[in-house]
């Protein structure tokens, strides 16, 4: 059995379990192209897998979390194949490197956010499959509501409740669902977008119910939104001071941090409001939200002032 046939069987198996396979399909098809689709599965060597993992999983001679992510996906595939006697051994590296999880989120300033949103409308010179207006709206919504990028890309039209200013967030990171409230400017943005979307759907006879569509009428996938974001930041000349790559997920970190700064400026009881923010973001543990308290110097300064006032009173 060659690698192409094996991957097809594996993805069909995953689908039969009603599992989400979009991300694993993307990875395995990339692995298939890297190795060669007609290579026999049992002929894949450990060095082949090692080179594939290193191709996108190493940076500056350091192993990244993406290396580990790729390894886990490939391991499940090969364990499945081994259990069915499609291979005699698992060709993955025997020793997994230690992955450093010390990545510091980047908090975008208001000026940087404005540049990102403006550049989203003109970041490509040539024809591309995404509507710039769609990408801009997706980025704005991701930041304004603190969404995970996958939550944004999975939104359906029926998830938007214009009458009650609510969004239904389904299929989250922890397989939970939640309701997210939105303020008037965000709902106005969504209403304008839905009106535009309706005209595009009618003109092109699209039938897909995803909220955000590309020019083929398909939902914009997460990896395309991430790629668009990187291109936008490059064109807008937005770079991290530590030399690391910009990340779409940092829009979510920026939302949470900016919200905490605003509460401190308003004199609100942040410790009381923190659980509310945690629920809003869909965190499973309050500790996941508390990390934002030390995310910026401005936030620490505000906290120190509040503490000093408390001590002196």
Task: Name each model feature, range by range.
Residues 1-313:
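Conserved catalytic core of the tyrosine transesterase superfamily
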